[in-house]
């Protein structure tokens, strides 16, 4: 994966289809312990949003690669007192080998990347969540043996996960459908990018009809109805999103061998029922584990880890 050495990952659109497949192949090798890589570098985590899976998986991945991790809580850095992002970026560039940022605005992430010479990884913004989708695609590939030609349906809020799924599925040669209530559509710019990548070779469908979107799909995916920072809207969103719940009834419209994904945390009884998330078609826990393997592959590729 020499092509990714020293590069940022701010969006899945930063990858080519070949680079995506190579990342997933490396993740599979690392997961099966067929390859022992070491990089001995220092990763900084600058997270302005709460995190369980992203924080822990990045930390464990870096330790397993022989590196070190510094957790940079913005609340105890000068960022919280108004230090300009560009100044912080240029200072961290002198201390760290790579930086993963979890923040609200995509623009803040891009400013860090513009001013820091070290690689910057998008660990979640309001616009995209590329590392999550790497794990999602790895999980789908493990379940079906391939990605090309499969149909993934996302049901719910057109949020950062939906945006990155549009890009990731298009890059992987998958059909992607997003079902959402009126007014909660994915980002228009991301949709245009996904359609350009798909180039009419695969389906990119946006609809307000969850049943239409689910029909014969091999993967059914959902996320919370109110993302971080939208907690005040949660109660008002409940009746709007109720028809977009992944239930056994909706799942019955999908391919009989369909799998169910959720990036977690889940609000059982809202976007997904208890029966579905705990059912035989759920791959949610494999999906969560694969955050570790996908991000380890990403770190190893960007840092140019050596085999031992």
Language-model segments: residues:
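Phosphate-coordination loops involved in phosphoryl transfer and adenosine-cofactor binding
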Residues: 37-43, 148-150, 257
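Rossmann-like adenosine-cofactor binding region
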Residues: 195-274
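C-terminal helix-to-coil terminal segments
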Residues: 278-308
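Short, structured coil segments at secondary-structure junctions
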Residues: 65, 115-116, 172, 254-256, ...
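Positively charged, low-complexity intrinsically disordered leader regions
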Residues: 1-56, 60
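Glycine-rich phosphate/diphosphate-binding loop of Rossmann-like nucleotide-binding domains
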Residues: 48-61, 144-222
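Phosphate/diphosphate ligand-binding glycine-rich loop within oxidoreductases
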Residues: 38-141, 268
């Amino acid at each position: 994966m020499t092509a990714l050495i020293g590069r940022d990952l701010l969006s899945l659109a930063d990858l080519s289809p070949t680079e995506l497949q190579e990342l997933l192949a490396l993740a599979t090798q690392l997961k099966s312990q067929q390859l022992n890589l070491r990089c001995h570098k220092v990763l900084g985590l600058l997270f302005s949003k709460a995190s369980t899976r992203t924080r822990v998986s990045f930390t464990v991945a870096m330790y397993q690669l022989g590196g070190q991790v510094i957790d940079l809580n913005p609340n105890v850095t000068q960022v919280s007192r108004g230090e300009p992002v560009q100044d912080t970026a240029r200072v961290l560039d002198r201390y760290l080998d790579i930086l993963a940022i979890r923040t609200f605005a995509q623009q803040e992430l891009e400013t860090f990347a513009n001013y820091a010479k070290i690689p910057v990884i998008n660990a979640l913004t309001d616009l995209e969540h590329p590392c999550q989708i790497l794990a999602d695609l790895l999980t789908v590939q493990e379940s079906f043996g391939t990605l090309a030609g499969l149909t993934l349906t996302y049901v719910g809020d057109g949020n950062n996960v939906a945006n990155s799924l549009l890009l990731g599925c298009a890059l992987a040669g998958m059909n992607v459908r997003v079902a959402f209530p009126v007014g909660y559509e994915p980002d228009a710019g991301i949709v245009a990018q996904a359609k350009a990548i798909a180039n009419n070779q695969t389906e990119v469908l946006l609809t307000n009809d969850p049943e239409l979107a689910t029909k014969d799909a091999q993967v059914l995916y959902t996320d919370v109805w109110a993302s971080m920072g939208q907690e005040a809207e949660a109660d008002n969103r409940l009746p709007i999103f109720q028809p977009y719940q992944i239930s056994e009834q909706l799942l019955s419209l999908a391919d009989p061998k369909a799998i169910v994904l959720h990036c977690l945390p889940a609000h059982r009884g809202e976007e997904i029922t208890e029966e579905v998330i705990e059912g035989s078609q759920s791959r949610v826990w494999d999906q969560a584990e694969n955050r570790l393997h996908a991000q380890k592959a990403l770190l190893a590729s960007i840092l140019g880890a050596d085999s031992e």
